[in-house]
Amino acid sequence: PVTGKMIAAMRRLGFERVYDVNFGADLTIMEEGTELLGRLTNGGVLPMITSCSPGWINYAEYNYGDLLPHLSSCKSPHQMQGAIIKSYWAEQNGIDPKDIFVVSVMPCVAKKFEKEREQEKVNGIPDVDAVITTRELARMIRRSGILFKKLPDEDWDQDIMGDYTGAGVIFGVTGGVMEAALRTVYFKLTGEEKQEITFEEVRGHEAGIREASLDINGTTVNVAICSGMRSAKVLLDQIREGTSKYHFIEIMGCPGGCINGGGQPYIRECFLPDEDDDIMDTYKEKRAKALYSEDEAQTIRQSHNNPQIIELYEKFLGEPNSHKAHELLHTSYAEREGFNEIATVEE
């Protein structure tokens, strides 16, 4: 119920179009999954590491410049969606990209840094013009005098970016990017949909490292998932030392993933409502469960089956990792100096 009212509130704040970034997440999976397959089959740099967490990217550029070739070249979902808005969507609507102002509402403070990167521009035009956090959005709604609880429930704008899948939904929890990618990689390797759609091996919201070895049509894919930079350091040092056994690694800067991002509302731990149940359930657990529940409720749960994603490639991009896709949806990284290694506290 909150989502519909949030959409209504944003329209009353002055936004002319409101889209769900889950569409961008589906697009990211198409590009990232294809990139991974290319590296696996063509002798590319492995392990490949996810690139959608800007806090992690910042850490890598300062502390692990020698490992930057391991990072996926894919932009993060909201940057990809911004690039599509200012290219395909602008073209479809006869609007000059320079006249479009894209604002991303994010759970992450580091997204403000990400959108300023020169590598996140196309022909000098930024994919995203401004980033506000979920906490800042709540403050804007309150200060504008909008009576949130009395708002009607409204839906996202549909046109060319209204559809999204369960795979896009689970991006927000640690392990979600990995699972979403594996659903599509499985299909591309086998030509069939996985009967049991979930990959329980990579699920969990806790900070730390999880690993799994998956046999996909005779191809063994070793994967690791971690959130929090302390855990990431362990995996990165293994790569440096030449002892890493993985093909694909997901790294999230925030323990638990984006659900625990630095821009999210402050919430204390709470007990489950059932008074007979004394199990402590934290807000991270509740948010993770909410995303997995929404994934299960989706009719379509694999990014490659999103009809609007299919249409976008047919009419505009050509195919994943095409020349046009690389121009719009991929980025690059550069080693930087001036920062000592970041000390983090995982909660």
Protein language model regions, located:
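Iron-sulfur-associated redox domains of electron-transfer enzymes in respiratory
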Residues: 1-347
